[in-house]
């Protein structure tokens, strides 16, 4: 299953400048997702991170992975009055810098679901090189 930006906007509660998933290229809802974040020089965070040497903040790479994970939980089905909230981040590692012009590939695989908590193994890559990874837990709750 694929998502265009219109589908993503309907699925996630985020909006500009904090919507960090541009396209979903593969999604098996409740199992796995592969999505894209196109990193452009026009991103507002590049104004201060860092002038003259723009680098995507690691925390926003993790947020991109968390947003992709939320789409994986929800799929294209609109779940009225429900939202996926980030619960925890474990073992986050940042391996390479992400800069303007990069296409960030976001992959998340559900490892387990227990008592409504979804645990994902997440990897972000650029040109098939791992740039970040983390284990992310999230929960589906009422808005």
From Swiss-Prot:
Q: What is its EC number?
A: 4.2.1.59
Write out the entry's keywords from A to Z. Cytoplasm, Lipid A biosynthesis, Lipid biosynthesis, Lipid metabolism, Lyase
GO terms (molecular function) for this protein are:
(3R)-hydroxyacyl-[acyl-carrier-protein] dehydratase activity
This protein's source sits in the domain of life called Bacteria
| Pfam name, any one | FabA
**Disulfide feature:** none
Query: GO cellular-component terms in the record?
Result: cytoplasm; membrane
Q: Quick one: where is this thing mainly located? A: cytoplasm
The listed locations are: Cytoplasm
Specify the enzyme's EC class, one word.
lyase
Q: Which chemical reaction does it catalyze?
A: a (3R)-hydroxyacyl-[ACP] = a (2E)-enoyl-[ACP] + H2O
Q: Name one GO biological process term.
A: fatty acid biosynthetic process
| Residue ranges of the TM segments | none
Which residues act catalytically here?
49
**Biological role:** Involved in unsaturated fatty acids biosynthesis. Catalyzes the dehydration of short chain beta-hydroxyacyl-ACPs and long chain saturated and unsaturated beta-hydroxyacyl-ACPs.
| Family membership | Belongs to the thioester dehydratase family. FabZ subfamily.
Annotated protein name in UniProt: 3-hydroxyacyl-[acyl-carrier-protein] dehydratase FabZ
User: Which species is the source of this protein?
Assistant: Wolbachia pipientis wMel
Q: Which gene encodes it?
A: fabZ
């Amino acid at each position: 299953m694929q998502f265009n930006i219109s589908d993503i906007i309907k699925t996630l509660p985020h909006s500009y400048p904090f919507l960090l998933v541009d396209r979903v290229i593969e999604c098996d809802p409740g199992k796995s997702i592969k999505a894209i974040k196109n990193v452009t020089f026009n991103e507002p965070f590049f104004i201060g991170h860092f002038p003259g040497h723009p680098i995507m903040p690691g925390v926003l790479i993790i947020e991109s992975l968390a947003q992709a994970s939320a789409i994986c939980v929800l799929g294209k089905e609109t779940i009225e009055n429900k939202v996926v909230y980030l619960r925890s981040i474990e073992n986050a590692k940042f391996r390479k810098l992400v800069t303007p012009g990069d296409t960030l590939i976001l992959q998340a695989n559900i490892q387990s679901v227990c008592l409504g908590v979804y645990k994902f193994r997440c990897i972000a890559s650029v040109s098939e090189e791992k740039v970040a990874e983390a284990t992310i837990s999230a929960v589906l709750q009422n808005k």
